[in-house]
Every structure is written in C-alpha cells, then in structure tokens.
Design a protein with these regions (language model features):
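Glycine-rich, basic loop-to-helix element that forms the pyrophosphate-binding segment
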Residues: 54-67, 307-325
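Short beta-strand-to-loop acidic/aromatic patch adjacent to the donor-nucleotide binding site
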Residues: 70-83, 327-338
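A conserved acidic beta->alpha catalytic loop
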Residues: 36-43, 81, 281-291, 309
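Conserved donor NDP-sugar-binding/catalytic core segment of glycosyltransferases
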Residues: 81, 86-118, 343-376
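A conserved hydrophobic helix/loop-capping motif in glycosyltransferases and polysaccharide synthases
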Residues: 3-15, 26, 37, 246-258, ...
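Short, acidic, metal-binding catalytic loop of nucleotide-sugar glycosyltransferases
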Residues: 21-30, 264-274
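Acidic donor-binding loop at a coil-to-helix junction in glycosyltransferase catalytic cores
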Residues: 157-166, 419-426
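A recurrent flexible, glycine/aromatic-enriched loop bordering the glycosyltransferase active site
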Residues: 117-144, 383-404
Length: 488
C-alpha cells in the first residue's frame, strides 16, 4: 500500500511539521523527504533531508528522481501547511492509476485572511505552455514517467526552469490530468489583484527566470516539431494602393469617461502621410456615441455603429479593417488609453518600412486615470528577440501594445470575434509566417482604472481567459507542426 514518496519544501520548519504530520496519516505514503535550503540544519523525525539550491532547479528535480523508490512521487511546493480532504490522497492516487497519467493535479481550497475560498484550476492542453500555469501546490507524478522525463532534460543548469522543463517533458509522452475535484486546502501567500499578477513576466527582476523559461520552451517546441527557424516571408508594401497611409481603429462601448481623450490623442498626430480614425461604436448607451459626435466636423473621423449586435472587440476590429477607407497600416488604440506624443503614428509607420514587418508592437507605460505612472511602469517586452520571438510568443501571455498591422495581411487573417485574447491570437498567426517588429520607445499610455477588463478578475473569469489563451496556443502549435511537416 506504500506507493508514494513525498517531497516537501522545508524552508519553514514549524510549518513543514504540520504538513509532515498530515502526510503521515496516510498508509499510501512510503517516505517523506524534506527539500532543504543550505542554511537550514534542522530535520523532522522520520523524514529524510535533501539539500537543494532552489526549489525549481534542474538539480533539485534530478535529486528527487534519484531518491524516489516508490511508484509515485508527490511534491508540495509551498511552505505553508497542507490539509487534505477526506480520502483525497487516495482519490488522487486512484485517478493517477486509472488514467495512466504522468502527472495529476486537482482543484483546491485556499485560506485567504482566514476565509476559505474555492480555487478551481483548468485543464492542461498541448498549448498550456505558460510557465506560470497554475497546477496548485500539490501534484502527483508517476515515478517511471518522472525519471524518464528527467533523463531527457537536456539542460542540467537551470536554476528556475527545472520543474517547468520536467512537466514539458512529461507532457510529450504521457498525459497531464486535471482532477476537477477539491482535494486539499492551502494557504494563499500572493493576494495581489489578477491585473497586477499578469505583468510578473515583464518585471526586470524576473529577467533571468524568463531567459531560462524561454530556453526550456524553445527546446520543447523543437522536441514536438513546432519550432520555427528565423526565416520570414518578406512584405511588399507597394503591391496595393491605399488612399490613406494609416488608420487608427478604436473599438468602444460605454467609455464616456475616456473616449474624448483617446480621439483627441489621435487627431493631434503629426505625420507626413494621410491618416484617419475609425471608431467602431458598439452600441454605447452611456453618452459615448454623443461624445464621438462632438468630433464629427473633423473629416478624418469615421464613426461606425455596426448594423449587428453580436460583435466582440475582435469583430469591431474586423469591421474597421475591412472599411473601404481603412489605410495601408492599421494601428491600435484602446478607448481607455492615449498616445504618449504627437509622433506615435509616424514612428510606427516608419518602423514598418525599416524592419519590413507585417506587425509592429510598441512600448507602453502604465498610468492611473490621472496619467501618473504606476507599477509596473514601462512595459517594453524586451524578452522579445527577432530570432526567437515567435517561438517564445507561445509561452508568454501577451505581445504588448500598441499593436499595428499591415492591413492586407490583417484582412486576410482576421481577428476572432471575442473580447479577450483576440489580439494575441492574430499576433501568433501573423508570427507564423512574418516577422513582428518592435519599438522600444514609449508610444502609449495605458490607463488602469476600475472599469478595465482585466483590472481585477475573479478566479472563474481568470480561468476562462487562461483556458481560451491556452486553446489559442494549442491551435497555433498544431498549425506550426503542420507547417513543419509540409516543409520536410
């Protein structure tokens, strides 16, 4: 019956003792090992100690593989106490055996400020390549699958990407199974709003972490036949004739507080080409329509109210892009935001010709409603490289802003008719064949306020968003595999 070797973090000995006591209640537990940082010399009776450098390193993963002798490996990655539900560990073991999974994980409860909350997680897909995919804090591995994956890990030097590399390797040969049952309770340590957490990967202090994660993901794409070499289709910008050099598109619904600022920031632009502004007003009811009409005397403004009622943000974009007055380049501006200067459009259009790209992504600065800079400040996505950006794009959670497109390419691909992830989906699709260029000057001020769509999401909405983006990645991964097979 002793089928599991458990490995738990031993950074807080007092807290770890509670978890050890919990595990020792189960007959299925064979051995308990304490993953111990170098500076801790204590131990717990009945447990073995494994000295580690970091919890997520390749070295730690290999030490676990060497120590494990039972059929299954359990890993708990938090220092706070763990509490199982009734027969929960047996349930997890049962599903692991029945499904022949390489790894299983489950929904869980959290204790936040003394309050118990439900914390469902999402299913794992081929495209679940985010290194911050939430498996919870307790997961169970088939030991044979774990050891096979460890042997196939090509980099032994990861300090941060070892566990990520492991699960990618496991996913290549066996299933990663989500048990949508609440099997344990953990104590929440990161209580920031979702809108703050989503920018963790661009925090400069996390840069070395991101370099390792990119390396692990890139190797995974090579392993599964989805890696794309840095060879891109060239763009011939003079093949089609346009009346306007560029169009800014603003999809909007009920943004009476901000729409005038957004429109004004476009109309103030100074360029050496003709441009216009296409505002797709998705049946606003709060006075936004009337606010847009205040600019009707400016011939550059095209105000569209769709004749259909089923458009998301992506659908509004498609309507603007396919308007006969749309310019050669299509440039994004959200209705909450403004351009940082009067030369933004000129810089973007110049970059298309200099970099020969089908899409350009700029740099933006986070501000409050009064345009004062707030953390995390400037979002420049310097993790992007011309050589590997389109591969790493399958791992990160967004491409940045402002986004701009060569209109003929965008008209051909089109955006999904959604109000989340539509920009990411089309960016991935474009990057499959074309180079995406970058501008590292701040072009755009992104205002965060209570009505932003991702300012603070509940767990259900966050899961919905993450599941959809993983689906987008899955479809793109499949398309790239197909593309690679055609080239053989």
């Amino acid at each position: 019956m002793n089928k599991i070797d458990a490995f738990i973090l031993f950074s807080e000995p007092g807290q770890a003792l509670k978890t050890v006591n919990e595990l020792q209640n189960y007959e299925s537990i064979n051995n308990i090992y304490l993953l111990t940082p170098e500076n801790i010399k204590e131990t717990i009776k009945g447990c073995g100690n494994i000295e580690i450098d970091t919890l997520y390193s390749s070295n730690t993963i290999k030490k676990i593989a060497q120590k494990a002798k039972s059929e299954y490996i359990a890993i708990y990655i938090k220092s706070t106490p763990l509490k199982f539900g009734y027969f929960a560990l047996e349930r997890m073991l049962q599903i692991a055996e029945d499904s022949c999974a390489g790894m299983v994980y489950s929904d869980y409860f959290t204790i936040v400020d003394g309050k118990k909350e439900y914390h469902p997680v999402i299913d794992y897909q081929q495209g679940s390549l985010r290194d911050d995919f939430n498996f919870g804090s307790f997961f169970l591995f088939n030991t044979i699958a774990f050891k096979k994956a460890t042997k196939r890990m090509k980099n032994d030097e990861y300090k941060f990407a070892g566990l990520y590399d492991l699960r990618l390797k496991i996913s290549q040969e066996t299933g990663i199974v989500h048990i949508n049952e609440y099997l344990y309770t953990e104590f929440e340590e990161d209580t920031r709003d979702s809108g703050k957490k989503i920018f963790d990967y661009v925090d400069p202090k996390n840069r070395q972490v991101q370099i390792e994660m990119e390396q692990a993901c890139t190797q995974h794409l090579k392993d599964v036949g989805a890696y794309l070499e840095p060879v891109f289709k060239p763009i011939e910008f003079n093949k089609e004739i346009f009346e306007y050099g560029a169009s800014v598109i603003i999809p909007v619904r009920n943004r009476i507080k901000t729409i005038k600022d957004a429109i004004s920031s476009v109309l103030r632009q100074k360029t050496d080409f003709l441009f216009n502004l296409i505002v797709v007003d998705n049946h606003s009811t709060d006075g936004t329509t009337e606010a847009i009409n205040d600019f009707k005397d400016d011939a550059r403004l095209i105000h569209i109210i769709p004749d259909r009622n089923n458009l998301g943000i992506g659908g509004c974009w498609n309507m603007g892009v396919h308007h006969p007055k749309c310019g050669k380049f299509t440039i994004q501006l959200d209705s909450d935001d403004i351009y940082s200067g009067e030369d933004t459009l000129q810089k973007i259009v110049d970059a298309f010709y200099i970099q020969n790209c089908a899409m350009i992504v700029g740099t933006y600065q986070m501000t409050n409603f009064d345009l004062e800079m707030i953390p995390p400040g400037i979002i420049d996505h310097k993790e992007w490289t011309p050589e590997n950006g389109r591969n790493n794009a399958l791992r990160i959670n967004g491409l940045g802003a402002p986004r701009a497109f060569y209109t003929p390419v965008l008209r051909k691909i089109k955006l999904p008719n959604t109000s989340y992830g539509e920009d990411y989906a089309v960016g991935l699709h474009i990057s499959r064949n074309y180079q995406i260029g970058r501008i590292y000057d701040v072009l755009y001020l992104s205002r965060r306020w209570e009505d932003n769509t991702d300012a603070s999401l509940d767990i259900i909405k966050m899961n919905e968003h993450n599941l959809y983006k993983d689906r987008i990645r899955t479809w793109e991964l499949q398309a790239r595999k197909k593309l690679k097979l055609k080239s053989l």
